[in-house]
């Protein structure tokens, strides 16, 4: 097993509280029948949640993503994922904690289920 695979496995076993909240919405095809994978490797990156069918990645960001070096890294990462045909949606931990209904509505819109 390579380092990235081991890291992805570790992350799957240690979801953040916000990842657990969103995973409870997405797992077992509960969100409109779509299948999601968590802590999935794409290239040299591990994404929080992936819906292969729709080529949509959902990322949950903590406060560390506000720092300059992390903003640069996230921008590079998102450009790479976009170049591979993926749409990347980002939510802050605060969004999950304080506005899960709003997060759900954004997901509905993104997946074309808002009607």
PLM feature spans:
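Basic, amphipathic alpha-helical patches used to engage nucleic acids or provide basic targeting signals
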Residues: 11, 15, 21, 43-110
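Short beta-strand or tight-loop elements
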Residues: 32-34, 38, 43-47
């Amino acid at each position: 097993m390579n380092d990235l695979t081991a890291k992805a496995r570790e992350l799957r076993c240690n979801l953040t509280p916000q990842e657990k909240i969103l995973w409870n919405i997405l797992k077992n095809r509960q969100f409109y029948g779509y299948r999601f994978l968590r802590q999935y490797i794409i290239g040299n990156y591990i994404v929080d949640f992936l819906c292969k069918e729709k080529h949509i990645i959902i990322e949950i960001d903590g406060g560390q993503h506000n720092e300059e070096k992390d903003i640069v890294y996230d921008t590079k990462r998102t450009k790479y994922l976009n170049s591979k045909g993926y749409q990347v949606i980002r939510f802050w931990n605060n969004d999950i904690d304080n506005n899960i209904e709003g997060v759900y509505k954004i997901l509905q819109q993104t997946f074309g289920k808002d009607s």
